[in-house]
């Protein structure tokens, strides 16, 4: 048996060598990345061996392949490395962890510098090592650092809750277990707005142009009572739902009782809502102290009150834009976002499926009213007055946008399985060459791990975790995510079946010992633990028994990826590109109309 295995290995090595002789170094790198993703690190070892003496990068990949294959004896031959990068530090740490040297493993896991996609997995593994040594104080610090580097890193929440429990911090442990925890080690890093001196909100009597188009924005439902103040008159009303009717009180006196919709007019003023009570308690989804331009309509629905703000479209945008983009961002980016928001609400007004309202706050609009208005965003709305995006047939476009495209936008078909639209066709970052076909596994790994310069990663508009990220799952964690009923047995492999032209995964297979699960594009992010995007490669590390024990999802971008990339727009704007050209880039077949009213 041993002789047969040795002979097979010899034949395989000769076959690999014969193929490698005709390969360039770049082709070898691409092939190795494909082996990493297909769960064949032993093939990567044999291929990398043919180049390792000539190429430091291939030597590096040979070591990583050996660690992935659980071949610690062979991996040890490559050590030490000079100035290892974060990915290499991660695998050196894994090597020492496998060798039982937890202290040295922690040293390598935590010795990288700067932002990188392996920061969260490195800190997480350091925490696991500290926990194995019963050093719960250090474990708490490392898990906290993992969450500071990547707030969506779900395995770290359970681990941090566990060590806090060990340290007697029961209340904190419960918060963390619910995913309700603000990391304190390094602070929130997923967004990075420029730090500038805050500006005051515009006065209530500020008057921009009006469109004459009225938006009906549903602010909240299930309200039982609230107070309303009209700033122009100083009048205060107390409004209640009682015995199937809307009761309006002023200075303690009932002035109106009705079962029909009741509207409070507010021409060119501000209304303020306070002491808001809902069926489930105070405030609910509508914060007390919320202020709005326009009129307020009060309706009865499901034995409670529904509040609908009737407001001019342009004034509505004053309260939308600051909720969609950082107000300190470049003015041309703000103008591009304003046009996109105007186009979106025009479409919603045309296609509203309810008689009561056009949009619902928190569901399909980020509208937050007067409280959120800022001079920069209001000026961006005013300067783009009446400008909107239309289809060639004359309908406003569904001007979708995302936080960060990762360098290539996606399509509605990939994101939701819906029909593609020419104005939402996938486009590369302005600095990136367009794909002619879906990228190969090797090309995708190169694009994510060693990306070219991009507008969607320009400081300070994009933070690294919104641009590139890495999430690690144990085999058991991945099984619980994709197969909670354990119908397919143990996971023995995963496979990307297909990608769209942007490189996003459109079909993903999980192979078990008892069956197979195929995940479609609409469900990939949710099924895999809420990944930031479906632009990723998946690599896995084998245990000594040959089965995978760790899966790494290494990806780019944040959000569905369709339409305008906000950080890309900011990067283009700061480079001197005007808002019209930004819009033409991200909505390629849309027509810009200067007068939509």
Please tell me what each predicted stretch does.
Residues 9-16:
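Bacterial N-terminal signal peptides
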């Amino acid at each position: 048996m041993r002789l047969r295995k040795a002979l097979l290995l010899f034949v395989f090595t000769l076959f690999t060598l014969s193929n490698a002789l005709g390969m360039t170094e770049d082709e070898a790198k691409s092939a190795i990345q494909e082996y990493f993703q297909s769960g064949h690190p032993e093939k990567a070892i044999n291929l990398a061996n043919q180049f390792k003496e000539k190429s430091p990068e291939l030597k590096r990949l040979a070591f990583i392949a050996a660690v992935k294959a659980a071949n610690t004896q062979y991996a040890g031959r490559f050590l030490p490395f000079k100035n290892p990068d974060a990915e290499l530090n991660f695998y050196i740490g894994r090597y020492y962890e496998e060798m039982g040297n937890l202290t040295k493993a922690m040293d390598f896991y935590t010795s990288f510098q700067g932002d990188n996609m392996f920061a969260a997995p490195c800190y997480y593994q350091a925490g696991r090592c500290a926990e194995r040594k019963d050093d719960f104080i250090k474990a708490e610090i490392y898990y906290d650092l993992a969450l500071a580097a990547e707030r969506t890193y779900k395995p770290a929440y359970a681990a941090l809750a566990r060590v806090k429990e060990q340290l007697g911090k029961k209340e904190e442990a419960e918060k963390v277990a619910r995913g309700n925890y603000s990391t304190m080690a390094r602070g929130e890093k997923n967004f990075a707005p420029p730090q500038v001196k805050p500006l005051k909100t515009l006065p209530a009597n500020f008057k921009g142009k009006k469109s004459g188009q009225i938006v009906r924005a549903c602010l909240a439902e299930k309200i039982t009572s609230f107070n309303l103040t009209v700033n122009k008159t100083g009048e205060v009303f107390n409004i209640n739902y009682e015995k199937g009717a809307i009761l309006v009180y002023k200075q303690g006196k009932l002035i109106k009782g009705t079962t029909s919709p009741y509207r409070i007019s507010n021409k060119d003023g501000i209304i303020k809502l306070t002491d808001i009570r809902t069926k489930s308690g105070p405030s609910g989804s509508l914060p007390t102290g919320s202020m709005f331009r326009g009129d307020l309509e009060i309706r009865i629905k499901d034995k409670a009150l529904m509040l609908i703000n009737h407001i001019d479209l342009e004034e509505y945008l004053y309260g939308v834009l600051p909720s969609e983009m950082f107000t300190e961002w470049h003015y041309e980016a703000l103008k591009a976002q304003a046009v996109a928001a105007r186009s979106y609400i025009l479409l919603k007004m045309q296609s509203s499926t309810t008689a009561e309202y056009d949009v619902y706050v928190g569901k399909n609009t980020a509208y937050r009213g007067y409280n959120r208005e800022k001079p920069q965003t209001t000026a961006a709305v005013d300067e783009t007055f009446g400008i909107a995006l239309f289809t060639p047939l004359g309908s406003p476009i569904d001007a979708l946008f995302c936080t960060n495209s990762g360098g290539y936008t996606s399509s509605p078909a990939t994101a939701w399985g819906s029909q593609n639209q020419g104005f939402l066709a996938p486009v590369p970052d302005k600095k990136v060459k367009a794909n002619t076909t879906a990228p190969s596994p090797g090309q995708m790994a190169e694009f994510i791990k060693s990306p070219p310069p991009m507008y969607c990663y320009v400081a300070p508009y994009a933070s690294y975790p919104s641009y590139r990220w890495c999430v690690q799952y144990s085999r058991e964690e991945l099984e619980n995510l994709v197969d909670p009923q354990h119908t397919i047995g143990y996971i023995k492999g995963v496979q990307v079946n297909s990608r769209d032209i942007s490189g996003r995964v459109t079909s993903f297979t999980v192979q078990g010992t008892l069956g197979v699960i195929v995940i479609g594009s609409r469900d990939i992010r949710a099924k895999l633990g809420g990944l930031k995007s479906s632009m990723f490669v998946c690599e896995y590390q084998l245990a000594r028994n040959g089965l995978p024990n760790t899966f790494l999802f290494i990806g780019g971008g944040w959000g569905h990826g369709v339409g305008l990339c906000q950080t890309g727009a900011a990067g283009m704007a700061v480079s001197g590109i005007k808002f019209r050209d930004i819009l033409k880039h991200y909505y390629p077949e849309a027509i810009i109309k200067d007068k939509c009213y």
